Every structure is written in C-alpha cells, then in structure tokens.
Amino acid sequence: MGSKLPELPKLSPEKHRWEKSNVDPRVLQRRGIGSEAIVGMERSNRRGQYDLYLLATLRTAHVSTSTPLSLLYLKEKLELALLVMRFEHPECACTVTWDDQVPPIIQYASPQNDEEALMWAKSSVHIRTTSQTGFDVRYEIEGKRQDLDQDNMEPSRPIVIYLISNVTNGDAQLTSGATVDVLLHMNHLFWDGISARMFTGDLFRELNKLINSNEQELPKLQWGTEASNLSAPVLDALKINIEELREEFEAASNQFVKALYENYGGWGLEFKSGLGLPRTDIHTSTATESKAIINGVKTRLGPQYTISHLAQAAVVIAMLEIIQPPNLTDKDIFVSPMPVNGRRWLKDGLADHHYSICETGAVIRIENIKSLVLNNNNDKGYRPRCDEKKPGEDVKKSFDQWLGNPYQLALGLAVHTLEASFLTANPMPFDKVAAPFFISDGRNEQFIPASITTTTGEILMTIDNFVFFLNQCLPYLAIRLESWKDASTLSVCYNKANYSQEEATKFLKCVAKYMLIFSQ
C-alpha cells in the first residue's frame, strides 16, 4: 500500500439518487454506494459470494378444521403477501446491472399489470417436499451454482423463498407438530442484515392477515405508484450536511482506512487458499444460560457493558488460544473492523423504513494482547486470561469512540466505496492468515413475530427458531451473535476451501466457552 493512504471518494448525493434510465424510461436506477459497492462487485455478486439466508423453523400448533394447512396453501398466501410487500418495499423486486465503474447500478421497474406482478410473486416461492432441512437446501443451492458458468450467471434475486417439509406432496395436510422450514435466500446488494429481518417480519405479519381468509383475489394495488416507496438515497437521508464535513471527518476516515489495512496484515488464523462451498455451523445457548451470561457481564464488567462486548473479546481470546503466538510483546495489538447498523445516523422518520443497505463500521482495537495471555513462552502452560476485564473494556472503548461520531455513517459510505475498489484490484487481500470477524445482530424478536396467528388470534404455527447466515468467500471466520426468544446463538460462516468443519467448530466452541465463564 505504501505509506500514503489512498484518497477517499467524494460523497456526492447527486450521483446516487434515483433517476430514469436512458435506455428504458420505465426503469428507475441509482448508483450503489458504501457496502453496496462491496457486495455488488460484479464477479462476486454473480457468484452469490455474499448472498444472505434467513431460516425460520415453523411448527403447527394444532390441526385446524377451519384452516387446513398445507405447503401449497402457505405458498398461495405467501404469494399474496409478497405482492403487498413489493408495493410497500419495492427493494424486493430490484435488479442490478453494471458498467465500467465498480459500484453497481441498482434498478427498479414497476410491473405493467396485476398479472405480471403475480407471475413475479409465484416465481419467488417454491415448495420442497423432502426430509432435508433449510441448511441442506442452502447447501444444495450453492453446490449446484458451483457447477455452472459462474461468471456469466444471472445474479441472485432480491428474495426467493423455499417452504420445506417432510410431507408426501404439497397438498398434504400438515399434522399437529409438523415442522416447516422457511428459507429466504436474498441477494445482499438489496438488503443488509437488519433490513432483511425487517422485511421477513413484515412478510410474516402480512401472512397473518391472509392466512385465515378464503379470499384468493389479488390485493388492489396501483402499480406504478409504488416506486415512491423505494428507500430514500442514503446520502439524502443523513442527519448531517455532508457539505459541512471538514478536517475531523477526514482524520477519522484516514484512521478507519489505516485500520482496515492493519486488519489485512495483522494477527489471524492460518487458512488454506482456494474458493469452495460456503458453510455455517451453529452453537445455541439456552435462554437460562444466555440470561446468566448477560447478568455476569453486568456484574463483572459494569452495567454499561453488553453481551456483544463480551463476544467480541471472546473472539480475540479464542484466536489467541488457537494460534498460540510465540514471543508476543507489549506492542502487539488486535485490530478488526466490525459492521454497524447505520440507521441511527438517518433523519428522524426514515430509520425505521430504510430497507436498502445502511451500514457503516467501527474499528475494534485491543492493545497489548500479550497481557491477555498467561505463560506466553511456555507451550505447556499457554492459556489466555479469559476472566480478565481488559479485552471487554478495550472493545467498549472502541465502540464508544466510533459510534459517538455524528458522521460515522458518512464515513462508512466513503470508506466502503474505497474498499470496493481495493477488493476489485486485490480479490484476495489476505496473505496466509486472516483475523476472525465479529458481527452482533441483537435480538431477532425485535423484527420477527413469535407465531403465525389468524386475525382472530388463533395460533396456527409457532416460530420455534430463527437464524441468519450468509455466504463467505474471503478466508476469515465470520462469528455472528444473535438471539431468538432469549436464547443466544453463535454462528460461524466460513468457506470450505479455507477451513475444515473441525477447525471452524473448534473456534466457535472456544468463543462459546469463554462467554459461558461469565455465567458462573
């Protein structure tokens, strides 16, 4: 890279607004920015290398005589719900194209009539009568994709839904206690992890309105007017005036860029080169264990600390146990970027309805990692100080520093646009080792209803579990923390070419082990 940091792209709102296409006046389009530029890189996006998956496991509460549930019945109702969702959130039907610039062009065209809209909805929902789980279907999707000419494939759609259950056919009535995995496959370009959950929750709530209704008529929607519901261009939605950004913004941006490059060349786990199938493994704590961990964090570290602070610290401690670095000095540090929901920096009234990507980042910096290790130069006695306050304190200090900036979203938009250009020129930025990457997504209950319920209040299906995961193409372990019904879930997303399942799950268990210490 050299000693001089690259110049950040200028944030120009006029370059990223919705406008009519010169090729087809029916099409609205805008230039991607920030994380959209990263996950929208043409080669990666066509290959689905950042695709998102959300998996909800539904269980029938009882056999209803008034509403005999089957996969076909659920498919028909979901199709109608999707029509309403497309009208309210057209992001779910956007497309992408590319030109000679790195950031993609995001496009939207209204359906010409109800029939075209219904055809789109029907093509978005699929039935799988199989003993496979949602995870199995995801692996099948990705396995088939690897057998194709990936560079010339059509990119993934914004959303495709799979209804998966072990029944004989789609008409078969679901018995009491039967499970249905609802797998949502999304192109990351059109959503981030928060808006993907927002959309899924909205979809399930719309399904609640329709599921006990005998009406099969299409909802009356005035197609053509829904384009006004597209999320506002993010630069126009910022609370701050980007024209007023000055030296402080530039200095913080340079600090962030420097940290990104430090991450590419810093401490990490050894990986094997190559690109294979994406994989995900899960570790779920019970609700009792999760509450005990949270209480332990508050008691040991202080009421202002969260389970997210602990989890990020545990990722670093687990890394030290796995790699057992020799000859650490007091100057050795751990640096890693962490994605952050950017909606807090949007204007009031826009944050709760922004479905396009709205993501920035914070830089986690833990000083003197030697101090986290006992018996550093004695292999037999090597072990991290897993009960020490320091890593959690450093994590919180990093969080507070970056999240307190009023311009943090603007900073992330500029830096991530720059990073997309860097990754286009350097598709493999890591050399031999890569630092594990931590993401905290919070409580899924904020977005997803606990059950599928009729308008009369009858619970037809409970949502027993909900988990989010994504495809991983870069050679780092992505550790995600989320929860469902008070039970915390740690997941690891990785690429099979870079790590074996044994290596990935070993690391995940190390993270969970150190977090559980705080429950004791």
Swiss-Prot record:
Spell out the molecular function terms from Gene Ontology. acetyltransferase activity
Which source organism?
Trichoderma arundinaceum
Q: What induces it?
A: Expression is positively regulated by the cluster-specific transcription factor TRI6.
Locate the compositionally biased regions of type Basic and acidic residues.
12-23
Functional description taken from the UniProt entry? Trichothecene O-acetyltransferase; part of the gene cluster that mediates the production of the antimicrobial trichothecene harzianum A (HA) that plays a role in Botrytis cinerea antagonistic activity and plant defense priming. The biosynthesis of harzianum A begins with the cyclization of farnesyl diphosphate to trichodiene and is catalyzed by the trichodiene synthase TRI5. Trichodiene undergoes a series of oxygenations catalyzed by the cytochrome P450 monooxygenase TRI4.
> What pathway is this protein said to act in by its record?
Sesquiterpene biosynthesis; trichothecene biosynthesis
Segments for region (Disordered): 1-23
| Protein name as it appears in the record | Trichothecene O-acetyltransferase TRI3
| Keywords assigned by UniProt, alphabetized | Transferase
What the record says about family reads: Belongs to the trichothecene O-acetyltransferase family.
Q: Which gene encodes it?
A: TRI3
Its EC number is 2.3.2.-
**Protein's GO biological process:** mycotoxin biosynthetic process
Coiled-coil region list: none
Matching entries from InterPro entries are given as: CAT-like_dom_sf, Tri3/Sat12/Sat16/Mac1
